[in-house]
Amino acid sequence: MRINPTTSSPVVSTLEEKNLGRIAQIIGPVLDVVFPPGKMPNIYNALVVKGRDTVGQQINVTCEVQQLLGNNRVRAVAMSATDGLMRGMEVIDTGAPLSVPVGGATLGRIFNVLGEPVDNLGPVDTRTTSPIHRSAPAFIQLDTKLSIFETGIKVVDLLAPYRRGGKIGLFGGAGVGKTVLIMELINNIAKAHGGVSVFGGVGERTREGNDLYMEMKESGVINEKNIAESKVALVYGQMNEPPGARMRVGLTALTMAEYFRDVNEQDVLLFIDNIFRFVQAGSEVSALLGRMPSAVGYQPTLSTEMGSLQERITSTKEGSITSIQAVYVPADDLTDPAPATTFSHLDATTVLSRVLAAKGIYPAVDPLDSTSTMLQPRIVGEEHYETAQRVKQTSQRYKELQDIIAILGLDELSEEDRLTVARARKIERFLSQPFFVAEVFTGSPGKYVGLGETIRGFQLILSGELDGLPEQAFYLVGNIDEATAKAMNLEVESKLKK
C-alpha cells in the first residue's frame, strides 16, 4: 500500500497562503469559517488559526473541516481548546488533511493527536509524515490466509488464540492486570516477531496514561538510555481533551502503525484504550455539528465511523496490524449500540476475571469466558482444538462442582469427580505464567512458551501422567518441564525440613 510522505504538519505554501478565511462563529470546540467564493477547503482539510488573544498570548489552534454549510461557510472541529479565539480572526487552509510523523523516530515517544511530541524530550524527526485519513487497503492487497498470531502467553494461545491481523476485545475492570498484559504483549511481539507496537490512549484518564508510561520505562519496553531501541510509540488524547482530539487520536495511532506495516513490512500491535471513548467523542462531535441523534443518543454515522477505523486494521501481503482494543461496556449493557457495533468487528475476546486475580492467578484471563473465531480444527488443527476443548470441559466441570465442594467437602465427591477437580486445579495454576515485564516486581524471570510446548503441557495434565505432582508445582511456571522440575525441588525441600 502506497504512503505519500508529505512535509511536516501544516506547513503552508505561498500559494495556499492566499486561501485565507475568517472565523464567523464559535460554538465551544466548533468553528464556522467564511472563505472567499471559489476557495472552499475540502472536507477533512486541516485549518490553522494563528494570532494573539486579548492578553497577548500566542494562539495556534488546528481544526478539521467537517461540513460545508453553503454561502462560502465551513464548519470545523478544533483539536485543542478554543480559548482566546474571536470572530474575525484569520484562518489558514493548509490544503491537506492532518499529517503526523511516522517511522522509527516515533518509537519511545508520546504524541498528541497532531503528532506533536508532548514528553519534553525535544523535537521529532518529521521528514516522513503521513495523512491520518486514508482508505483501507484494497482487497487485492489483503493477506487472506488465516494464521494464528503466537503471543507466547499460554492461556491466550491455547484457549482464545489471536488472529494475525485480527481484532481482539480486551474486557476487564480496574486492577485485574490489563496494563501488565498489554506490556507483556508489546514485549513479546518485539522479541518473537521483530515487530513494534503503537498505543493509542483514547479518552482515558491522564493519570493512567502517565502510569503506563512510567511502567513501560521501568520494565524496559521504553528504553530511556537509547530511545531508538524502544518497542512502542504512544499517542494520547485523554479525557480532558476536546472531543475533536479524542475522535481523531485513534486515527493518528493507526496511521503510525500503518507505516510500520506497509513500508517497514513489520508485524504491528495496535492498542486502543478505550474504543468506547472513540464512539463517545464521535457522539459529542455529531451533536455539536447539529446532526439528528440515532439510537440511545449516539451519532447516526456510528457504524460508518467504526467501520472506517476497523477496516484499516488488517493483514496485507507486506505485514500485519493486530489490534487489541479495551472495550468499556456502559452500565454492563452489551446491547448498547457502542459495544454492540464493536463486537461485530472482533475476531477474539480476552476477558480478565477478578476472581482469578484475587486467587493470584496471573494473567487473570478467564478460560471459559474468553472466545476466538480462530479456535476451529481446520485453522488450528485437530490436536490443538481437542486439547483446548478438554481443558475447557475440565474447567467447566470444576466450576459446576464448586458449590458441592463448599457445602459438603471434597470427600463427598465420586472418585472420577475428585480426579477431575485435582486436574482442573493443576490446569488453573498452569494457565498462570511469569511475565518478562513483571520481573522487576516478582523477582521471577519471565517465560515465553511456544504453542507446541503449551499443547504438550496440557495434554500431559489431562492424560493423568502428572497426577502425582503437587498442584503448587504448576503455579507461575513456563513449560511443563519446569513444573516437573519444580515438583522435584519441592519434594527435596520437604524432605530437608523433616
Swiss-Prot record:
Coiled coil (UniProt feature): none
The organism's place on the tree of life at top rank: Eukaryota
Reaction(s) this enzyme catalyzes, per UniProt: ATP + H2O + 4 H(+)(in) = ADP + phosphate + 5 H(+)(out)
GO molecular function: ATP binding; ATP hydrolysis activity; proton-transporting ATP synthase activity, rotational mechanism
Binding positions for ATP per the UniProt entry: G172, G173, A174, G175, V176, G177, K178, T179
Cellular localization per UniProt: Plastid, Chloroplast thylakoid membrane
Signal peptide from the UniProt entry: none
Keyword set includes Lipid metabolism: no
Keywords: ATP synthesis, ATP-binding, CF(1), Chloroplast, Hydrogen ion transport, Ion transport, Membrane, Nucleotide-binding, Plastid, Thylakoid, Translocase, Transport
BP terms from Gene Ontology: proton motive force-driven mitochondrial ATP synthesis
Enzyme class: translocase
Entry EC no(s): 7.1.2.2
Pfam families named among the record's database cross-references: ATP-synt_ab (PF00006), ATP-synt_ab_N (PF02874), ATP-synt_VA_C (PF22919)
Protein family (similarity comment): Belongs to the ATPase alpha/beta chains family.
Function noted in UniProt: Produces ATP from ADP in the presence of a proton gradient across the membrane. The catalytic sites are hosted primarily by the beta subunits.
Subunit and interaction comment: F-type ATPases have 2 components, CF(1) - the catalytic core - and CF(0) - the membrane proton channel. CF(1) has five subunits: alpha(3), beta(3), gamma(1), delta(1), epsilon(1). CF(0) has four main subunits: a(1), b(1), b'(1) and c(9-12).
UniProt-recorded name of the protein: ATP synthase subunit beta, chloroplastic
Species of provenance: Licuala grandis
